[in-house]
Amino acid sequence: MKPRPIIFVIMLNVTICSAHVALSASNQHTLIRSLVSAKLSLQQGLTLAQRHGQPISGKFEVEDGKFQLSVYVANKEQFSELFVDYNTGKIVKSEPITQSGDLDAAKTQSAALTKAKITLRAAIDKAVRGSWGFRAVSVTPALKDGHAIASVVLLKGEEMKNVEQSLE
């Protein structure tokens, strides 16, 4: 038995994983750099999205190399992803959520919010108040041990941290 094919497969996997990590690091660097110039906060983006339904999650992200503010909203039994201009506050695009992975996430987030007693915005405000100098990058609700929580990602300079905030 020749060990070369096995070594080649291992090296190929390492190369692919390294490329993925580098891409993620590049996106994170772009996110950090771009967030500094965003005039809108995540909380303001959630408030603006309320005109289109109940905000169920939100995030600043880099997708396909482009920095954007995305908010998932629920309106009755329909879910949409809104793209908010992070400088003007205008909703620039609204897309129905139909892909199974995104749709499953939206349903899970919406279900978690049925147990919530405070809004996502209020949860973000609490997380930010408890972390001086940090800014909210994303908020995602979930159920943990039967209780509604919000996972809030915060950023200060290049330091990112995740804060779990009760929604009850």
Features from the language model and the residues they span:
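Long, terminal "pre-/pro-" and other extracytoplasmic accessory regions
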Residues: K2-N13, C17-E168
